[in-house]
């Protein structure tokens, strides 16, 4: 009898959990919006949630199946979102009528110190004030000074590669996991430019900054699980006061920044890094920012820059090894730039003048976009209409909007032969043909990425140094189908980003 009661209880519990997991799935049926059938718990994100596919691939394939609809219902796990497939509608929501959609959706439910103080998470006037405070931090003039710090990290990376080539005398080049190498580079650049800390993760791969930083990245196993849990059961996550990040590790980064600020103020020390720029911005702002709010802007580099900058270098070098004509043309521009420097170190201005470099990076950002999508949250009821005034949809306060960046980037209506790597799409002659709001590598509207200059100068600087000294070729372990082999948030193959580097001299 007891066994029967236990079985019945389990059946009831299982049924209740199932009903909870599907409770939102009638949303679009009731609001008369086309949608694809979702699955319990995972919605329309089954493959990505189970890490059998990358988020980019899952979202792009969803877009390809539904792109004939200007708007379509989409379930991010249990959360209903309205996807805007039409560029003109994206313009309306993200630019023209921004006041109705000024915020991002709650990315995750977090009880973590610092997380809710990040610019990308802030809302309304608080976000606006911080954005205005930070905008002068990312001007070309400020990035120009910071580039000198990046040059030091580029040099250390090249020294490491040079040492690797010398350990294999007589061989034509050597194999390297570009992802591992670029993670260390990204880490060291963030350490010096955002936290005022000098580390060399090639000579000392066990340094505290690198190991703690690696453990905080969302794509890592435990962090990924916690992220998915906070997305699936946000109220429970908040109620139990669970945290995604180890508080001791968060405190480590906070302590680095606060102690650096205190030391510099006491000894009147300046350095062209993010801490210095934030200190100056804080002093010039009418708002009274707390230390945690300042620290959070440095902390965001681990989420906005660490993986993204590393992956952009990896996907670009991946394309260069499979497109040797592009690689050779870029190398020729690099050699010309090197000659023009006349023995001087690489500068921010020199990098900015490299037109083909910019075309290559732009095409890489199109084909292998850093963020598969961006989002908005409706803050005021809003009726979305077509150009002729036809009503398309009534948005309610709290509705979440999905902008399918990767889908737009790979849509053959906007980019012919979208799977082809063709930097000439971004030539002066052709880029004017691009349909507005179909190319969104750094987001769209007032809430676009504030740090795009920072990201681009790091990637361009590293590619300049790498291609100047090495030719990139395929190795036996080079992945052939990156699209099909990647999983998680970014295009990182499970087996690694292996490539063969051949010294040019």
UniProtKB/Swiss-Prot annotation:
InterPro entries hit by this protein: Cyt_P450, Cyt_P450_CS, Cyt_P450_E_grp-IV, Cyt_P450_sf, Insect_CytP450_Detox
Protein family (similarity comment): Belongs to the cytochrome P450 family.
A Pfam family annotated for this UniProt entry: p450
Function: May be involved in the metabolism of insect hormones and in the breakdown of synthetic insecticides.
Keywords for this protein: Endoplasmic reticulum, Heme, Iron, Membrane, Metal-binding, Microsome, Monooxygenase, Oxidoreductase
Annotated protein name in UniProt: Cytochrome P450 9b2
PROSITE patterns documented for this protein: CYTOCHROME_P450
GO molecular function: heme binding; iron ion binding; monooxygenase activity; oxidoreductase activity, acting on paired donors, with incorporation or reduction of molecular oxygen
Main location: endoplasmic reticulum
Protein topology in the membrane: Peripheral membrane protein
GO CC annotations, alphabetized: endoplasmic reticulum membrane
Enzyme Commission designation: 1.14.-.-
Subcellular location: Endoplasmic reticulum membrane; Microsome membrane
Known cofactor(s): heme
Binding positions (heme): 449
């Amino acid at each position: 009898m007891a066994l029967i009661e236990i079985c019945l209880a389990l059946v009831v519990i299982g049924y209740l959990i199932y009903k909870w997991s599907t409770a939102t799935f009638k949303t679009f049926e009731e609001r008369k919006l086309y949608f694809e059938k979702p699955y319990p718990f995972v919605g329309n994100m089954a493959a990505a949630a189970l890490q059998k596919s990358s988020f980019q691939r899952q979202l792009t394939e969803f877009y390809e199946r539904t792109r004939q609809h200007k708007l379509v219902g989409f379930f991010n796990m249990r959360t209903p979102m309205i996807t805007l497939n039409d560029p003109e509608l994206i313009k309306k929501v993200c630019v023209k009528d921004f006041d109705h959609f000024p915020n991002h959706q709650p990315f995750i439910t977090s009880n973590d110190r610092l997380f809710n103080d990040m610019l990308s998470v802030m809302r309304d006037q608080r976000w606006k004030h911080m954005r205005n405070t930070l905008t002068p931090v990312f001007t070309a003039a400020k990035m120009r000074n910071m580039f000198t710090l990046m040059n030091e990290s580029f040099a250390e990376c090249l020294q490491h590669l040079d040492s690797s080539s010398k350990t294999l005398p007589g061989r034509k080049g050597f194999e390297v996991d570009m992802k591992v190498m670029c993670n260390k580079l990204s880490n060291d650049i963030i350490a010096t430019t955002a936290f005022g800390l000098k580390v060399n993760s090639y000579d000392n791969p066990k340094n505290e900054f690198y190991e703690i930083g690696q453990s905080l990245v969302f794509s890592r196993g435990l962090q990924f699980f916690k992220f998915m849990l906070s997305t699936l059961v946000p109220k429970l996550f908040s109620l139990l006061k669970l945290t995604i990040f180890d508080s001791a590790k968060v405190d480590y980064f906070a302590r680095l920044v606060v102690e650096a600020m205190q030391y510099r103020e006491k000894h009147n020390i300046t350095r062209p890094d993010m801490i210095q720029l934030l200190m100056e911005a804080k002093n010039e702002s009418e708002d009274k920012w707390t230390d945690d709010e300042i620290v959070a802007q440095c902390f965001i580099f681990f989420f906005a820059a660490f993986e993204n900058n590393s992956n952009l270098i990896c996907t670009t070098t991946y394309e260069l090894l499979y497109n040797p004509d592009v690689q050779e043309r870029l190398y020729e521009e690099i050699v010309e730039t090197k000659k023009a420097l006349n023995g001087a170190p690489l500068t921010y201005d020199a990098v900015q003048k490299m037109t083909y470099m910019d075309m290559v990076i732009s095409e890489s950002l199109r084909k292998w976009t850093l963020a598969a999508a961006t989002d908005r949250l409706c803050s005021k009821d809003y009726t979305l209409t077509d150009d002729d005034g036809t009503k398309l949809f009534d948005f309610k306060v709290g509705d979440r909007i999905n902008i399918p960046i990767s889908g737009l980037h790979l849509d053959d209506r906007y980019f012919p032969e979208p799977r082809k790597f063709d930097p000439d799409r971004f030539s002066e002659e052709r880029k004017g043909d691009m349909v507005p709001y179909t190319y969104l590598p750094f987001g769209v509207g007032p809430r676009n990425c504030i740090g795009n200059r920072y990201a681009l100068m790091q990637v361009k600087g590293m590619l300049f140094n790498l291609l100047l000294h090495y030719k990139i070729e395929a190795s036996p372990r080079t992945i052939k189908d990156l699209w099909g082999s990647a999983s998680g948030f970014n295009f990182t193959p499970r087996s690694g980003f292996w490539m063969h580097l051949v010294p040019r001299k």
